[in-house]
Amino acid sequence: MTAPRDPDALIRRAGRPNPDFDQHFLIDDRVLDRIPTYADGFDRGHVLEIGAGTGALTDRLLSVADRVTAVERDESYASFLREEFADAIAAGDLDVVAGDALAVDLPAFTCAVSNLPYGVASEVTFRLLPAGKPMVLMYQLEFAERMAADPGTSEYGRLSVATQHYADVSIVETVPAAAFDPQPRVESAVVRVTPRDPDYVVADEAFFLSFVKALFTQRRKTTRNAIRNTAHISGLDDPDAVVAAVDDDVLGTRPGSLSPATFAALANVAWGVETAPGPDPQ
């Protein structure tokens, strides 16, 4: 088996990161070697990597995946990847896509493994989650903690509910700033995302997510007041009618204490009120 490429040597050959692209390249060999193992049990027939950079993780993924698609926004690094991994590309094992991961067409991947660009981590995550595929993704630690947070904790919020609507989320490793070049100002974390159907039903998914977003803008208010105060965000025409249809026990709590299932039940009530046919004209 060929030894993995040296991440520091890859940076020397590819060129220093561009600060305008918020690039922080993982250079700790031990972490790089561990990341693919967190995808054990996932279908690695076609692995998607977002933010491939100089290819240190790409190199490790090629050793465990049947095929890898690497997306890289920086054209200079995309060109370097095509040159550095020319043999893998020629063999059909690697595709390099130059472009913004929020805009390019993504392949029908079987799992995603990435050290995400932190500036677009949220947007990329919510582009990938609806695909229902397992993922191993690197985030800022604070972001990862919010993804995995439980109701009633200070970290719990819109991100927690929306992520856990699609998948089980677990932090599998915390990564220090020293593992990157250049070093970020914060710690990072590797998150394992295992898709599953929620144990509740939502009447309309887009409305559910919008409703959750709205209520968390008033997280310190009671749920009663949050529903009334955020109709301009959630799109409710008659928030008082929604409040009247919900149990007082729920209305008296704060949004931060509501489970995803309770949010779903609330959203379903609101959706039912909003879409109920009006009275027949006389």
Swiss-Prot record:
EC category name: transferase
CDD domains according to UniProt: AdoMet_MTases (cd02440)
Cellular-component GO terms for this entry: cytoplasm
GO MF entries: RNA binding; rRNA (adenine-N6,N6-)-dimethyltransferase activity
Coiled-coil regions listed: none
Protein's cellular compartments: Cytoplasm
Transmembrane spans: none
Keyword Methyltransferase: yes
InterPro entries, per database record: KsgA/Erm (IPR001737), rRNA_Ade_diMease-like_C (IPR023165), rRNA_Ade_Mease_Trfase_CS (IPR020596), rRNA_Ade_methylase_Trfase_N (IPR020598), rRNA_adenine_dimethylase (IPR011530), SAM-dependent_MTases_sf (IPR029063)
Pfam families: RrnaAD (PF00398)
Keywords assigned: Cytoplasm, Methyltransferase, RNA-binding, rRNA processing, S-adenosyl-L-methionine, Transferase
SUPFAM superfamilies recorded: S-adenosyl-L-methionine-dependent methyltransferases
Main localization of the protein described in the UniProt heading: cytoplasm
Enzyme Commission designation: 2.1.1.-
Entry binding sites for S-adenosyl-L-methionine: H24, L26, G51, E72, D100, N115
BP term (GO), one: rRNA methylation
Role: Specifically dimethylates two adjacent adenosines in the loop of a conserved hairpin near the 3'-end of 16S rRNA in the 30S particle. May play a critical role in biogenesis of 30S subunits.
Family recorded in the similarity comment: Belongs to the class I-like SAM-binding methyltransferase superfamily. rRNA adenine N(6)-methyltransferase family. RsmA subfamily.
Cross-referenced PANTHER family: DIMETHYLADENOSINE TRANSFERASE, DIMETHYLADENOSINE TRANSFERASE-RELATED
Protein name, per record: Probable ribosomal RNA small subunit methyltransferase A
Species in which this protein is naturally found: Halobacterium salinarum (strain ATCC 700922 / JCM 11081 / NRC-1)
